Amino acid sequence: MSLYDTDRRTIAVQDEEERKGSPRQGWTIAWCHTADSGGSKRAAFEMVRELAKRGHVVDEYILRIGEPNLKHWPLTPFIRKSYRVSVPPIANRYRPYVLAAWIGVMQERQQVRALACQFRDLGRELKARGYDYVHIDHCFPSYTVQLTEHLSLPSIIYSHEATDARFQGQDILSAPSNAPWWRRNYAALCNSAISKVVSIRRQRDLAGLRGAGLVLTNSCYSKEALFQRNHLSSSVCRYGVDVDTFKPLRLPRAKTVLSAGRIVEKKQHHTVIQAVATISEAERPAVIIATPETPARQEDPDYSHRLEQMAKDLRVKLEIRRNPAEQELVRLYNEVMALVFMPIMEPFGLVALEAMACGTPVIGVREGGIRESVVDGVTGILVDRNVDDAGKAIERLIQSKELRDRLSLQAAEYVQREWVWAKTIDCYLREVGSVISNPPKAALR
């Protein structure tokens, strides 16, 4: 485990002001995150960029078990320095599975203790470096929030994923009721170990959240989920979108729909394929799945194979685009007829905003945070989690150019008006200012 400076660049304007003795115009912030891919990292990228524009100084602290993904939305152009606190993952190749499961419980406790030791040292370092506050990005289950237990500085947690509801049961072994007694007992013993690991993570997660001076969430759904989970109050600070990058390009639209997100079952790409398969072959669009991952970092290769086989069996044309560059993604949004977004209880769903900013209607599941960004009948179509309903919505868009054009225009205008990152940071700074005493000059402008 180590804490070290990765020797990142300093923003030249800030250095020049410090040399000249200019009065400090903004806060000095320690920004802690895990450097994962996905919407939470994009949010960190955009928020840090906007904070740097406004004169705030940000140092990055990457806190994680294992190696971070440093290539996905790096914060380096906008920060002063980057530090990393890392714990190497503990290999667990024991067999049989029940032995590995119970050894995993001991390893989980060992890693929690190791992190606590490092976070005690880090808490002292952060205080010595004179930060105004510590910002911690949180996605359950996340080890980052354990840092609050070792801080004397004010701490702000931004909870991108407030609950583990959509992960529950994914590792549980099942045994039919008519299975032999030994098989049922074996599954129960394994599941007991899995439950203990989950319990350890929940306890540490809740303790860390309770230690924060302020908790922010990205949606009303996340705020409600956090309160339901542990009666913890929070404030909503919604995401935005970079409308200078994600914008209509007026490109021809192919008879194709897009499903976006990591290749994991909770993103429900298979539901999109099944929905498209309900449409007659003559009208059936192709499906493109865009994922921020590369095959080497893909979380669930088995699920990827299942998707490809399902598309083949259902006679749906499927293409998977891995780790597209930003401009490629913008072009992709502009070339498809719709984003079909059906994840399980998505806390927010940043890709829906990106698609709408490009003038692409969103067919979204009426769940979670998606209900708060997609306006049914105005910027897209909301449906229940039903492949037939989703298929009918896709078919409506394919058959009606008038509907596509109307939703497209309204979606782009709506996002440009209501969902820009500048508004996110306005809200963020107001909330931070309510818990930080003596804000520096112009910090809340």
What does each model-found stretch correspond to?
Residues 361-364, 374:
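Short hydrophobic beta-strand element within catalytic cores of glycosyltransferases
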Residues 344:
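Aromatic "clamp/platform" in nucleotide-sugar-dependent glycosyltransferases that forms part
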Residues 301-324:
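Nucleotide-activated donor-binding/catalytic signature segment of Leloir-type glycosyltransferases, i.e.
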Residues 250-267, 273-278, 287-289:
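Conserved donor-binding/catalytic core segment of Leloir-type glycosyltransferases
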Residues 65-67, 286-306:
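Glycosyltransferase donor-sugar binding loop
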